[in-house]
């Protein structure tokens, strides 16, 4: 009995320090963030310029890093919440260094908490 109070106190402290589940991404913020990132790419800005602006957007896109040019894109009207992240499908038209243009179906995974991060999902369907 004399150990019950200290044990309960320790348990309360431990449980009080544990964070709850992470917040889900804000779907109303995800779409405009993705559009801003795609417009930056299309206009010739670098990924670093996108990260340096306010609000900062981190976009991990290999084709952009490889200096493929985004000629055009078409986002689906709505993204979907998948787990705690937003998934948005986009038709993109890319031009490589030789000038050849190709259409691609892309799927972007967007997180808005604690910061805006956009990653192209090359493995998902």
Regions found by a protein language model. Give the residues of each.
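Exposed beta-sheet edge and beta->alpha loop/turn motif
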Residues: 81-125
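Positively charged n-region of N-terminal signal peptides that target proteins for export
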Residues: 1-4
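Short structured motifs
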Residues: 72-77
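C-terminal motif of bacterial Sec signal peptides marking the signal peptidase cleavage site
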Residues: 13-16
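Soluble non-cytosolic domains of exported or imported proteins
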Residues: 24-32
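Bacterial signal peptide processing site
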Residues: 18-20
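Post-signal-peptide N-terminal segment of Sec-exported extracytoplasmic proteins
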Residues: 32-71
């Amino acid at each position: 009995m004399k150990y019950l109070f200290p044990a309960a106190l320790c348990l309360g402290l431990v449980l009080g320090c544990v964070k709850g589940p992470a917040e889900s991404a804000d779907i109303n913020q995800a779409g405009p963030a993705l559009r801003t990132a795609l417009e930056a790419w299309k206009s010739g800005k670098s990924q670093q310029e996108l990260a340096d602006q306010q609000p900062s957007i981190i976009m991990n896109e290999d084709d952009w890093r490889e200096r493929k040019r985004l000629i055009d894109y078409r986002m689906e009207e709505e993204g979907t919440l998948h787990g705690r992240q937003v998934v948005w499908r986009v038709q993109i038209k890319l031009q490589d260094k030789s000038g050849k243009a190709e259409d691609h179906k892309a799927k972007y995974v967007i997180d808005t908490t604690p910061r805006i991060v956009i990653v192209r999902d090359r493995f998902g369907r």
